[in-house]
UniProtKB/Swiss-Prot annotation:
GO molecular function annotation: glycerol dehydrogenase (NAD+) activity; metal ion binding
Binding site for NAD(+): 39, 96-97, 118, 121, 127, 129, 133
Keyword list, A-Z: Glycerol metabolism, Metal-binding, NAD, Oxidoreductase, Zinc
EC number(s) per entry: 1.1.1.6
Organism: Geobacillus stearothermophilus
Catalytic activity: glycerol + NAD(+) = dihydroxyacetone + NADH + H(+); hydroxyacetone + NADH + H(+) = (S)-propane-1,2-diol + NAD(+)
pH dependence text: Optimum pH is 6.0-8.5.
Protein name: Glycerol dehydrogenase
């Protein structure tokens, strides 16, 4: 008996300039008590605007300052505040950890969840999972939910004013979507959605990649100028919606496993963003598979145009020994890691691919960057 095809997605996705000013319209009839979660910086950027708009729509808002860590203690602390406020709606505003915490709080309360990302830096906003850390920021577990967010609200004016590095990181995270989904589909592997990929997820993942190669560089320059352009709108949708649906229902493989493998090492690498590490992981996955030089160099060229890392030196591992890289490879091939969705490889194979990807990128840089 073949496995079931499963596709999951948020109930509603809204993207555009100044959409946070319409938040009350989207919540009409759902509830009149909310809890709004944002960190101190994001309160200034978007939090207060959201609360003011809710009040105009006769919706009460309990304001919570997020501590900075998506930990069980923080989830419990905010869930207690939300219970006392009798909140039927949880609104998370900000970056990945804030949004992951908001999802967990809504799950505790069985509440309606609204996600408002302030950067297009990862594909996490649309997903039905959170990454939970210890209070000290050490990865603990994935927490899966029975449903995706009820509403994802992406204000491109806010995204255009976020640091360009965050958009580039989101593009890197999203570029892994098709590379990974394609390999999971080919091998008949499982996805985060709990089944095999659908034709819909395959089409979305492929369109994600096409959009990023077409508009990625233009969107990056738009954010440098702090302006909203058609190219930025296209890339924000690719980074957030297309990549979010594509990774969850299309499948994760080696690129994200290698990203997770890097946690086995200490040092400067941890100052890199999620997407920056995934960029290198994607090159490693391409090196693990049979791809032409032209195909691999297409990715290297786009990464370099977005100031993304492509070599071990770029990800602060210039002096890493084979022993160090084997540690990464062993962690990337640990039981339950996503690499097994698409590959039957050993840690040794992965270590070889890491050194190969590094060499391919170094050679490309020498040839083209003089």
């Amino acid at each position: 008996m073949a496995a079931e095809r499963v596709f999951i997605s948020p109930a509603k996705y809204v993207q555009g300039k100044n959409v946070i000013t319409k938040i009350a319209n989207y919540l009409e009839g759902i509830g009149n008590k909310t809890v709004v979660i944002a960190d101190e910086i994001v309160w200034k950027i978007a939090g207060h605007t959201i609360v003011n708009e809710l009040k105009k729509g006769n919706i009460a808002a309990e304001e919570v300052v997020f501590s900075g860590e998506a930990s069980r203690n923080e989830v419990e602390r905010i869930a207690n505040i939300a219970r006392k406020a009798e909140a039927a709606i949880v609104i998370g505003v900000g970056g990945g950890k804030t949004l992951d915490t908001a999802k967990a709080v809504a799950d505790e309360l069985d509440a309606y969840i609204v996600i408002v990302p302030t950067a297009a830096s990862t594909d996490a906003p649309t997903s039905a999972l959170s990454v939970i850390y210890s209070d000290d920021g050490v990865f603990e577990s994935y927490r899966f939910y029975k449903k995706n967010p009820d509403l994802v609200l992406v204000d491109t004016k806010i995204i255009a004013n976020a640091p360009p590095r965050l958009l580039a990181s989101g593009i890197a995270d999203a570029l892994a979507t098709w590379v990974e989904a394609r390999s999971v589909i080919k091998s008949g592997g499982k996805t985060m959605a709990g089944g095999i990929p659908t034709i819909a997820a395959e089409a979305i993942a492929e369109k994600c990649e096409q959009t990023l190669f077409k508009y990625g560089k233009l969107a990056y320059e738009s954010v440098k100028a702090k302006v909203v352009t058609p190219a930025l709108e296209a890339v924000v949708e690719a980074n957030t919606l297309l990549s979010g649906l594509g990774f969850e229902s299309g499948g994760l493989a080696a690129a994200h496993a290698i990203h997770n493998g890097f946690t086995a090492l200490e040092g400067e690498i941890h100052h890199l963003t999620h997407g920056e590490k995934v960029a290198f992981g994607t090159l490693v996955q391409l090196a693990l598979e049979e791809h032409s030089q032209q195909e691999i160099e297409r990715y290297i060229e786009l990464y370099l145009s977005l100031d993304l890392p492509v070599t071990l030196e770029d990800i602060k591992l210039k002096d890493a020994s084979r022993e160090d890289i084997l540690k990464v490879a062993k962690a990337a091939t640990a039981e339950g890691e996503t690499i097994h969705n698409a590959f039957n490889v050993t840690a040794d194979d992965v270590a070889d691919a890491i050194f190969a990807a590094d060499q391919y990128a170094k050679a490309y840089k020498e040839k083209h960057r003089k």
